[in-house]
Design a protein with these regions (language model features):
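Sequence/structural signature of beta-propeller domains
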Residues: 1-249
């Protein structure tokens, strides 16, 4: 299967098996396929987009005054884009709502997170959909975790308002100090929050787990038992404490 930078992929079972490490047999097994959303093929895009982060909304809820619906997509791109005659910047987060739920061939775009308003450039992000405890902090539904312009830290953004006018409730804080005790030697490239216990293939992910990818190889990740990761590997953080200089996982 071939794809472009504007297409979304999904990773599913191969021959009935969907396996992840480190659970035996400790070999990642599955198949990539196209997920049915192609930003390049939409009539109102410029045909040359590069998606660098995406989240599928899994339930109806309101975040920072914006009513989100199950199946909505939150998207950021690696460069500035013009979609439907509207200019978006790298670091903005776009909201795509399909015209027909589950059919991503047509829909509408709007601005969900305006980087200019809050002086934060989202290079990786995950939106909490439920209240969940991460380490020693309780996150609320609607809290946004993000990396600012290729950072090794994960910030917590608490909203007063999302949308074309984005307003923070207080100053965004460092939730995960990646280049402190965790020893990240590379920037974070992707991020996801598990806000309810989830079974994927042969792995159970407890609520509060963070899934992270780095942009390059790093042989010493973690404050306890360290692991080595290669470029674009996904690994989990089971966080015990948060904050600058005090993050452990």
């Amino acid at each position: 299967t071939s794809w472009t930078a504007g297409q979304v992929l999904k990773f599913g079972p191969s021959g009935g098996s969907l396996l992840f490490e480190p659970v035996a047999p400790a070999i990642t097994t599955g198949t990539f396929s196209l997920a049915g959303f192609n930003l390049d093929s939409l009539s109102f895009s410029d045909g040359n987009t590069q998606i660098d982060a995406l989240q599928v909304v899994t339930r109806d809820f309101t975040a920072g005054g914006v009513a989100l619906q199950k199946g909505d997509l939150l998207i950021s791109t690696s460069g500035n884009e013009t979609i439907g005659g509207v200019a978006y910047e790298h670091g903005d987060i776009l909201l795509f709502r399909p015209t027909t739920p589950g059919n991503y061939s047509t829909g509408t775009f709007s601005l969900f997170f305006d980087r200019t308003d809050v002086a934060l450039q989202a290079s990786a992000f995950t939106l909490g959909e439920r209240a969940v405890v991460v380490g020693d902090v309780t996150l609320n539904a609607g809290d946004l975790l993000l990396c600012d312009n290729g950072s090794r830290d994960i910030l917590r953004f608490v909203p007063t308002q999302y949308g074309a006018t984005t307003i923070a409730n207080g100053t965004p804080s460092v939730l995960i100090d990646g280049d402190g005790n965790l020893g990240f030697g590379q920037d974070i490239g992707a991020l996801a929050l598990v806000d309810q216990t989830t079974v994927i293939g042969n792995v159970t992910l407890p609520a509060g787990t963070l899934i992270v990818s780095l942009v390059n190889e790093d042989a010493t990740v973690g404050s306890g038992t360290q692991i080595g990761v290669t470029r674009r590997d996904l690994f989990t953080l089971s966080v015990t404490t948060t904050g600058v200089g005090t993050t452990s996982a």
